[in-house]
Amino acid sequence: MSELTKELMELVWGTNSSPGLSDTIFCRWTQGFVFSESEGSALEQFEGGPCAVIAPVQAFLLKKLLFSSEKSSWRDCPEEERKELLCHTLCDILESAGCDNSGSYCLVSWLRGKTTEETASLSGSPAQSSCQVEHSSALAVEELGFERFHALIQKRSFRSLAELRDAVLDQYSMWGNKFGVLLFLYSVLLTKGIENIKNEIEDSSEPLIDPVYGHGSQSLINLLLTGHAVSNVWDGDRECSGMKLLGIHEQAAVGFLTLMEALRYCKVGSYLKSPKFPIWIVGSETHLTVFFAKDMALVAPEAPSEQARRVFQTYDPEDNGFIPDSLLEDVMKALDLVSDPEYINLMKNKLDPEGLGIILLGPFLQEFFPDQGSSGPESFTVYHYNGLKQSNYNEKVMYVEGTAVVMGFEDPLLQTDDTPIKRCLQTKWPYIELLWTTDRSPSLN
């Protein structure tokens, strides 16, 4: 087994997990990208864990299906179209991961039937025809096991996107086999570069896959969503006790919302909360699903008041709803507002008449951005995807359709429900109400 293989295993699985535990978690991750029989473009997830890869792939697949295709019946997805969609999606994610790595791309595959001595492992062998490598799901996981599988994988490198796209398409059967999800994950990690990932992760000793529960880390989710394996979901970088904590640096194509924000464990920044396309990964405590819509008006450019709210909140990392008055000048400069000292003092007195030394978000927005509501439609059709059969209505992996209504602060609330999915979506739309076409609300778990 090569040093690169060992580094990869430590990055993903950690160094101290027992072999038995590794095999248990490993088996939960050994599945391919398999489409649902009930919904042509929906990927199925067999056990808990691999949603950290499957959900982002599903989200980017939907982006391509909904916004790069002219077809009207988007839910009608024949096999040849699925093949093309999946391969293009995998390439897009690999391209995003490779942006910091001088345009070099990697694919990891496994060599069935080879001995450890015969296998180059991750020695970086040059690109070769796929006929030299067998991609079959016939060999059971139990026959391989954790150690054996990692002794039978190899890396191939590509210098151009065109070569990569041809290889990904050529190896379509590999992505659907029993190891497809892991092989794609390893391809992303090696395309990004192990050292690059370690430089972005807050604690490089923490594995990307939890060795006890098998869940993917936030760094892994962020890597697949943005191409950067940072550990946080806020906008930009922050300093804490002299330590630099990396966040998200630009608007993501696909967004991220989490129930953890509704529970006040974290605060997702605008770059993930307001993505380029109306598709969001939705996180519960243990699982990832996808919430999406076809209405691009949902991701219209920020209104000035929304930009002001975002900038104000970067100076309020604790989400208190206020900042010290000493920071008012910084906020106003960041928003290109008048910021000469006399005017700043005038505004401090107006916004803090009691002299408490704080500036509240509400009065600040009302002063500089009055009568500016949130942009976007008030009512829109939405869909929810959950890859686990047992979590779906009638145990069929299908998109659940619904109608979302976004109300103003002063509107009487319809109060349709108080479900986890609604609480999660309220972190993006505080006054959202949801009406689903099924008898029960979609599950986040």
UniProtKB/Swiss-Prot annotation:
Intrachain S-S bonds = none
- Enumerate the active-site residues: C51, H287
The UniProt keyword set, sorted, is: Apoptosis, Hydrolase, Nucleus, Phosphoprotein, Protease, Thiol protease, Ubl conjugation pathway
Cite a single GO MF annotation: cysteine-type deubiquitinase activity
Q: Provide an example Pfam family for this protein.
A: MINDY-3_4_CD
For this protein, the Enzyme Commission number is 3.4.19.12
Question: What's one GO BP annotation on this UniProt entry?
Answer: proteolysis
Give the catalytic activity: Thiol-dependent hydrolysis of ester, thioester, amide, peptide and isopeptide bonds formed by the C-terminal Gly of ubiquitin (a 76-residue protein attached to proteins as an intracellular targeting signal)
GO CC field = nucleus
Locate the Phosphoserine modifications and list their residues: S125
InterPro entries according to UniProt: EF-hand-dom_pair, MINDY-3/4_CD, MINY3/4
Tell me the function of this protein.
Answer: Hydrolase that can remove 'Lys-48'-linked conjugated ubiquitin from proteins.
Sequence similarity: Belongs to the MINDY deubiquitinase family. FAM188 subfamily.
What's the protein here called? Ubiquitin carboxyl-terminal hydrolase MINDY-3
Give the organism the record lists: Bos taurus (Bovine)
Q: Which gene encodes it?
A: MINDY3
